[in-house]
């Protein structure tokens, strides 16, 4: 692990904490996602890594490698210096139609590529879309922890995803087409960019998941009067927000929609995108699937110490006091992660209650 040096912490997610690291030789910056060794290393983690490794597209965060430390499994990936698209909307309030289209075109291009590779994301949301640091930012899809490859795994059945973005069919306990659920989530992302609010959340009571679920099932949304968007854009949203996934617009159809095609950058045209779909398109990873699976299997063994140690088990990060502070920071971040997981559990509980009550009906 002498290859990397720490630059700074960059936050926490569903499975662990993340740090910005620098490759000592090349000075290249990478984002390093840390997942504590032991029971947290499950099939979702393995799936995320294998799925991510297979993807090579400019609108998808590049996977680099996995590394085992004494306490954590570390996943190295491309660093997106522009941060989350979510943060950009929070500071802007909402986007103009042209700006929303600019990012939506990139999102659809990335999702289209994932689907062609037989991978559906299942947790598309603004927080999982990052931006690079260029003046005209390039959108990057990240976080494949909930993705499901139809080549390697069974059809999606579990209820995952973020309440505000979740498609009606995901709330039913029947099997669903993960690709069509991704289309719905892309529609929610577009709506949020245009309006600055979630389409199916009650603004007065956003934590009321039951109300959100009911509005999703009834496809109850509206464009506020103060938001002026074209009829073309309204038409696209109305074709995405369709409860019956068989009648919903597909990714291929979105790519032919007049609103999508307006001002489409040359690099996003079908001709330019064709290069990424070639079988010989190599992976960015230097590790084979077998090497990765062995490292992930080894990571299932819990760390020898009960508490996290400084540097995530890499050592060499300053004096002993520094290490203790580092460990406390890590523990605080992991506590935050656990709190987020509790929120997920609360959501799952609500979904189960709705299932049990028989309120969910898919036409």
From Swiss-Prot:
Acidic residues composition bias: residue spans: 322-347
Record's compositionally biased regions (Basic and acidic residues): 348-363
Keyword Repressor: no
Ranges for domain Protein kinase: 4-260
SUPFAM superfamilies listed in its UniProt record: Protein kinase-like (PK-like)
Gene induction: By abscisic acid (ABA), salt, and osmotic stress (at protein level).
Disordered as annotated region, ranges: 306-363
Source superkingdom: Eukaryota
GO molecular function: ATP binding; protein serine kinase activity; protein serine/threonine kinase activity
Enzyme class, first EC level, given as a word: transferase
EC number per UniProt: 2.7.11.1
GO BP annotation list: response to osmotic stress
Protein family according to the UniProt entry: Belongs to the protein kinase superfamily. Ser/Thr protein kinase family.
Protein name: Serine/threonine-protein kinase SRK2A
Organism in which the protein naturally occurs: Arabidopsis thaliana
Designated gene of the protein: SRK2A
């Amino acid at each position: 692990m002498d290859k990397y040096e720490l630059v700074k912490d960059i936050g926490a997610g569903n499975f662990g904490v993340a740090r910005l690291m620098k490759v000592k030789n090349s000075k290249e910056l990478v984002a390093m996602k840390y997942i504590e060794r032991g029971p947290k290393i499950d099939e979702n983690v393995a799936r995320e890594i294998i799925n991510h490794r297979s993807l090579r597209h400019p609108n998808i965060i590049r996977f680099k490698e996995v590394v085992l430390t004494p306490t954590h499994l570390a996943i190295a990936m491309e660093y997106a210096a522009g941060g989350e698209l979510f943060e950009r909307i929070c500071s802007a309030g909402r986007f103009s139609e042209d700006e929303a289209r600019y990012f939506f075109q990139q999102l659809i291009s990335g999702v289209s590529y994932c689907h062609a590779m037989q991978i559906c994301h299942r947790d598309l949301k603004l927080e999982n879309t990052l931006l690079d640091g260029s003046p005209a930012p390039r959108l990057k899809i990240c976080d494949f922890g909930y993705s499901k490859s139809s080549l390697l795994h069974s059809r999606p059945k579990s209820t995952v995803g973020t309440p505000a973005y979740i498609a009606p069919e995901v709330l039913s306990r029947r099997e669903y087409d993960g690709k069509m659920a991704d289309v719905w989530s892309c529609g929610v992302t577009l709506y949020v960019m245009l309006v600055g609010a979630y389409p199916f959340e009650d603004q007065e009571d956003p934590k009321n998941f039951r109300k959100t679920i009911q509005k999703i099932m009834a496809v109850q949304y509206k464009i506020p009067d103060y938001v002026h968007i074209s009829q073309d854009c309204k038409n696209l949203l109305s074709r995405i927000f369709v409860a019956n996934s068989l009648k919903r617009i597909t990714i291929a159809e979105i790519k032919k929609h007049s609103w999508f095609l307006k001002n489409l950058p040359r690099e996003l045209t079908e001709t330019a995108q064709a290069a990424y779909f070639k079988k010989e398109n190599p992976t960015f990873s230097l590790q084979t699937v077998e090497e990765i699976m062995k490292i992930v299997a080894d990571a299932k063994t819990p760390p020898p110490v009960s508490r996290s140690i400084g540097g995530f088990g890499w050592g060499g990060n300053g004096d002993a006091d520094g290490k203790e502070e580092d460990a406390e920071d890590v523990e605080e971040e992991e506590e935050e992660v656990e709190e987020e997981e509790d929120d997920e559990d609360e959501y799952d509980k609500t979904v189960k209650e709705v299932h049990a009550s028989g309120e969910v009906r898919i036409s």
